[in-house]
Amino acid sequence: MSYLRRCLPLAQQITLLNQPAAPVYSICRQRLFSTSSRSFTKTYLFTLDRPILQSTTSTLSGQHKIHTSAHHFKKRKIQEETQKHELDLLRYDIKALKDAPKPALYLGLAGLIPFVSAPLLMNVTGCYYPEVAFAQVAYGASILSFLGGVRWGFAIPENSPAKPDWMNLTNSTVPALLAWLALLFRDNITEAAVLVIMGLGIALHYDLALLPTYPSWFKALRAILTVVAVFSLVGSLINSSVYPHKSLVSQEP
């Protein structure tokens, strides 16, 4: 009966650790194996009323808990997928740029010429031209209106993943409104350029985070084009404070 004296205290400890749950029913079995000169005793402890995959105490001393339930694994998997999705948004799916259609890729890169040429011309000549800077801002305003129209047109088709709801259609009008406000600051190019930069950033945020339904290659292309356009506008703003101002149109006295 020595094996019963060994098992009963163990069962009592397990019962105390699992309170207020139902008591643990244990069955102790003894198997004797006889060899030439020794006998070996093996004691088995079976828990009948609790599943194996359950959040229990890892040791009898109660140091910490190990979560092994299926619900915990599922929740952890969802959290990992969410974090991975956020990281994908931060990377802007740059690797998918190689899948972009050639016309979209080439026309998008060619659309950067009006942005880049303005600060490049100022750096080469060593002068700041207000007319060139305003032409750059006006081009940026037209691009903002184009981006808003793209979102609107993407939500119109019946099979589109973006639905024509209030969120999609309302947010698509924000870039156009910022473009209109920028054009009102004709005599103050600095404020106009800041509005265009804000509009480009907001439009990119909508497309990548708030409304991430565009193809991966388009999001990658949008990110690259937006970054280059913003830096070009910032370059023109820096040139306005570095180089002397010179007008391209001769002013009559």
UniProtKB/Swiss-Prot annotation:
Keywords: Membrane, Transmembrane, Transmembrane helix. GO terms for cellular component: membrane. The chain crosses the membrane at residues 104-124, 137-157, 165-185, 192-212, 223-243. It is a multi-pass membrane protein. Pfam families: DUF3429 (PF11911). InterPro entries: DUF3429 (IPR021836). It is found in: Membrane. Signal peptide: none annotated. It comes from the Eukaryota. This is Transmembrane protein 69. It comes from Xenopus tropicalis.
